[in-house]
Amino acid sequence: MRNYETLFILNPSLDEEATKAAIEKFKGVIEKEGGVVENVDEWGRRKLAYPINKVNEGYYTLINFKANPELPRELERVFRITDGVMRFMVVNPEK
């Protein structure tokens, strides 16, 4: 298993319950595919460097996890089809 981290930005118009549900959904995808979530760091609402779809703020969350090399592709697919995700990135911090 390799170490990965994902940082994603959720639309700030989501209420707190929807934000928590989205984070749990992504953690569930990682665990369902055989990964292990090591740390979830919610940075909260922050100003974006530039507007995305006329939105100036976003809800940032960082998840560190261990997984097989196939899992990041599935996680990215889920990010793309989930409403409310403005930006995301999955990286291997060792490289």
Swiss-Prot record:
Name of a matching Pfam family: Ribosomal_S6
The keyword Repeat belongs to this UniProt entry's keyword annotation: no
InterPro entries noted in UniProt: Ribosomal_bS6 (IPR000529), Ribosomal_bS6_sf (IPR035980), Ribosomal_S6_plastid/chlpt (IPR020814), Transl_elong_EF1B/ribsomal_bS6 (IPR014717)
SUPFAM superfamilies, A to Z: Ribosomal protein S6
Residue spans crossing the bilayer: none
Gene Ontology, cellular component aspect: cytoplasm; ribonucleoprotein complex; ribosome
Keyword set, alphabetical order: Ribonucleoprotein, Ribosomal protein, RNA-binding, rRNA-binding
GO biological process, one term: translation
One annotated GO molecular function: structural constituent of ribosome
Family annotation (CDD domains): bS6 (cd00473)
Function: Binds together with bS18 to 16S ribosomal RNA.
Similarity comment: family membership: Belongs to the bacterial ribosomal protein bS6 family.
Official protein name in the record: Small ribosomal subunit protein bS6
Species lineage: Bacteria, Bacillati, Bacillota, Clostridia, Eubacteriales
